[in-house]
């Protein structure tokens, strides 16, 4: 145990905040980490001392005991069983452990905690599908690069398939305890990395991890009626676990591409359909495409205006895990003719002249609008 003042070791004042202590420790740890100072015994010793200091000062109870009793608070009993790896913190691990400690809080927990079970990591795969695929469902083929159990050692990590043996440091528990004064600290065993077992003769193909990189081809069943952003879980299809531990899961995230004709709102579909001016005025029947590839007939009543909506029941999207379907809504867009011939213009003028006395009846919306404008001007004049 270092006899130097722990606050001096980290370069902070005695009243420093926990954040200041953490920042100072990270700076010192980066500077003196053995990976950055190979073969430098002084740097290695300094690294151990600042780990020892940080292990005490980062803990509220231990810091209070140190402030009251100094080093004497931790001289009873000394370190317990387990050995190796310093006094918590980054331990004797590689340089990447520092970044695990620094950024672990953003990943749902501290450092290398997830390695204690050896479970493989979960994977994410983003898949684009069409609206038609979302309606009908499909079976898609995906190729996912991931780790898989090593074929040479069958995932055990041992040469010629040799099985791991119980770790003598933690006796198979994956955790070791250290007694420091009044406190007992439990941490991941640095010898077996929390696995509880070690490989005496590692497999050359996988280096003892029991895993190799591999691209696997999977069939993904996409049910009819899925929504944009739907997540599909494939259990056990993620990264392989360490030395035979359970594999992680694969999550397929679906993104439905925008359609050229249809707009979706839940189980319903909307479609803007251009209606010829004559059909809108006289009425008639039109054919419209549907999401299932068929055509449906829609009756257009006389006097249809832009914005009028017509409903086709059960012509919308499939409903997830149900035989039902949503509805399709046709939104009329009355199309004004362009590029008219001389004869067409003559006919339209004749039509306009013929209806001169019927405008209030033929065009109620426009007549009502201009009547309101006239009233407005009269009110302004009177005011």
Swiss-Prot record:
InterPro entries registered for this protein in UniProt: DnaJ, DnaJ_C, DnaJ_domain, DnaJ_domain_CS, HSP40/DnaJ_pept-bd, HSP_DnaJ_Cys-rich_dom, HSP_DnaJ_Cys-rich_dom_sf, J_dom_sf
Official protein name in the record: Chaperone protein DnaJ
Residue ranges constituting the J domain according to the UniProt record: 5-70
Primary localisation category: cytoplasm
Cofactor notes: Binds 2 Zn(2+) ions per monomer.
An MF annotation (GO) of this entry: ATP binding
UniProt subunit comment: Homodimer.
Binding site for Zn(2+) 2: 167, 170, 189, 192
Organism, as annotated: Paramagnetospirillum magneticum (strain ATCC 700264 / AMB-1)
Lineage: Bacteria, Pseudomonadati, Pseudomonadota, Alphaproteobacteria, Rhodospirillales
